[in-house]
């Protein structure tokens, strides 16, 4: 059986989350959580929250052994971009793009 968790509109660039997401793909859940715990990136904290949620969702399925779960799919998609204006000198303005991410984690039994 598999369980999934999705976090939408996370306020971090997908490019930054994908750096961390590649490290946990295919790993057992305990090992993946340890990797995320000791990775000094903002994306690691967000991924660990989604991974904990996926494990909690798997616990709700009858007959699933939580200790034998492994990370099957980690998908980071681009969400909508928030446009903001940064005032500059001499009446100019620069556009700031605040990027968002949709993070999907799927865990399954080994």
Swiss-Prot record:
InterPro entries: Ribosomal_uL22, Ribosomal_uL22_bac/chlpt-type, Ribosomal_uL22_bac/org-type, Ribosomal_uL22_CS, Ribosomal_uL22_sf. One of its GO terms (biological process) is translation. Transmembrane segments: none annotated. GO terms for cellular component: cytosolic large ribosomal subunit. Keywords: Ribonucleoprotein, Ribosomal protein, RNA-binding, rRNA-binding. It holds the Pfam family Ribosomal_L22. SUPFAM superfamilies: Ribosomal protein L22. Gene3D superfamilies: Ribosomal protein L22/L17. PROSITE patterns: RIBOSOMAL_L22. GO terms for molecular function: rRNA binding; structural constituent of ribosome. The keyword Ribosomal protein applies. NCBIfam families: rplV_bact (TIGR01044). Part of the 50S ribosomal subunit. PANTHER family: CHLOROPLAST 50S RIBOSOMAL PROTEIN L22-RELATED, LARGE RIBOSOMAL SUBUNIT PROTEIN UL22M. Belongs to the universal ribosomal protein uL22 family. This protein binds specifically to 23S rRNA; its binding is stimulated by other ribosomal proteins, e.g. L4, L17, and L20. It is important during the early stages of 50S assembly. It makes multiple contacts with different domains of the 23S rRNA in the assembled 50S subunit and ribosome. This is Large ribosomal subunit protein uL22. It comes from Maridesulfovibrio salexigens (strain ATCC 14822 / DSM 2638 / NCIMB 8403 / VKM B-1763). The lineage of its organism: Bacteria, Pseudomonadati, Thermodesulfobacteriota, Desulfovibrionia, Desulfovibrionales.
